[in-house]
């Protein structure tokens, strides 16, 4: 099979097929170039300390390739390969982190309990990463600040208004415009995804 010189120009299924067949060039480009920002973000959200990227991604790759790449063969194209890979990576790294905690006797049991159910954490981590990505697409960083403080951090409106040098009434107007802008960006992203799927 002949590939382009950029995995971004390949279809999702072409990438999966190339990974399953252990194509060295595609494997390197995908895990160490194209998906590097994605995996770095996942590791930053999952681990509270710095980890070795190459080491952890190599282990993740071996995990995917176990039993004749059975996990890669589960990709069905219902989402993009990057969205799918993000969820798989989050699950893997949360399990790895929790396993490392289990091996550390000095960690208090309450700390382990506070981490909650892994499935819930996968969903929360995925949602946080999706929101941060949408924030990065918003040109008006004041809107991002207002949504982050009022919605995500649930800060008091009076305090946020003071931080922005405005009043509460104006702050609510800013919040309304900010959520409208965020919704428009999210809908545009969904539309782009649907167009890619139809190709």
Predicted regions and their residues:
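Conserved RNAP core-binding helix
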Residues: 12, 32-33, 40, 50-70
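Short amphipathic alpha-helical boundary/capping segments
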Residues: 15-19, 43, 130-140
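A short, charge-rich alpha-helical start-of-domain segment used by transcription regulators
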Residues: 17-42, 51
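Arg/Lys-rich amphipathic alpha helix in sigma70-family domain 2
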Residues: 86-106
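Internal acidic/polar
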Residues: 100-128
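Short amphipathic alpha helix immediately N-terminal
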Residues: 135-163
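DNA-recognition helix of helix-turn-helix
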Residues: 157-193
């Amino acid at each position: 099979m002949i590939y382009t010189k950029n995995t971004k120009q390949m279809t999702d299924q072409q990438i999966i097929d190339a990974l399953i067949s252990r194509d060295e060039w595609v494997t390197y480009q995908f895990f160490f170039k194209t998906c590097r920002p994605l995996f770095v973000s996942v590791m930053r959200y999952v681990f509270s300390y710095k980890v070795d990227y190459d080491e952890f991604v190599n282990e993740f790759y071996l995990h995917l390739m176990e039993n004749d790449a059975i996990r890669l063969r589960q990709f069905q194209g219902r989402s993009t390969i990057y969205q799918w890979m993000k969820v798989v990576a989050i699950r893997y790294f949360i399990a790895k982190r929790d396993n490392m905690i289990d091996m550390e006797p000095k960690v208090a049991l309450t700390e382990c309990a506070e981490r909650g159910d892994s499935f819930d954490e996968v969903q929360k981590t995925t949602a946080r990463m999706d929101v941060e990505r949408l924030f990065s697409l918003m040109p008006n960083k004041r809107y991002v600040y207002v949504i982050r403080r009022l919605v995500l951090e649930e800060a008091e409106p009076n305090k946020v208004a003071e931080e922005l040098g405005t009043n509460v009434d104006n702050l609510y107007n800013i919040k309304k415009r900010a959520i409208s802008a965020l919704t428009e960006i999210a809908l545009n992203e969904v539309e782009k995804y649907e167009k890619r799927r139809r190709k």
